[in-house]
A protein has these predicted regions:
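Conserved catalytic cysteine-centered active-site region
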Residues: 24, 55-110, 140, 148-157
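Condensing-enzyme catalytic core mediating Claisen C-C bond formation in acyl metabolism
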Residues: 1-24, 36
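Single conserved hydrophobic/aromatic residue that forms the stacking wall/gate
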Residues: 162, 166-171
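Phosphate/pyrophosphate-binding loops at sites that engage ATP/ADP/AMP, CoA/4′-phosphopantetheine
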Residues: 37-47, 168
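Acidic, glycine-rich active-site loops and adjacent beta-strand->loop/helix elements
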Residues: 10-13, 54-58, 87-91, 115-125
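Flexible glycine-/small-residue-enriched beta->alpha junction loops
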Residues: 110-160
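Short catalytic helix/loop segments, enriched in acidic residues and glycine
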Residues: 21-39, 137
């Protein structure tokens, strides 16, 4: 296995819901921090083989290509692969783990990785609109709230923290 080194790290500020970053695209934020991280690393963009980013809540159509948009926007080659991962709260960390594995296995000599999310821009989904809401009300689903609720009926994820915290073993 190849050794892995972190050459640089950057991040944006953590914004509050509906705060000063609410109108910022996760792609634009990702490009800004990736460009800065590459600049600090001392590597040229053509020396970076792969980009991996975590993202859960798409805020616009191009977010389906968020990793590709970030890497190309940060100056990486069009030919460099990009991968988006969704592991809910752990997506950014999973991106870093996956990039580490690429380098360890020799599938990349250098990679960029991170997460890009603007929950304030989480949209609403109206399933009936695809084929037409013919008569009656069309239900809307808050995709941000959907991402914060356990799909197996256990409730809001923040509530789950309060449930699990008292039951974890004391170290």
């Amino acid at each position: 296995m190849h050794d892995v080194f972190i050459m640089s790290a950057t991040r944006t500020a953590i914004g509050g819901f509906g705060g000063s970053l609410k109108d910022k695209s996760p792609i634009d934020l990702g490009i800004a921090v990736t460009s800065e991280a590459i600049g600090r690393s001392g590597l040229a963009t053509d020396e970076i083989d792969h980009g991996i980013y975590g993202n859960v809540i798409h805020t616009e159509a191009r977010d389906m290509y968020i990793s590709r948009c970030i890497t190309i926007g940060a100056g990486m080659a069009d030919s460099s692969p990009a991968l988006t991962v969704n592991r809910l709260c752990g997506s950014g960390l999973q991106a870093i783990v996956s990039a580490t594995q690429l380098v360890q296995l020799g599938d990349a000599s250098a990679a960029v990785a991170g997460g890009a999310e603007v929950m304030s821009l989480g949209g609403y989904h109206v399933p009936a609109m695809r084929w037409g809401a013919r008569l009656g009300h069309a239900e809307m689903t808050d995709m941000m709230l959907g991402a914060l609720h356990d799909p197996f009926g256990l409730g809001h994820m923040l509530s789950l923290i309060h449930i699990s915290e008292p039951t974890r073993p004391r170290l």
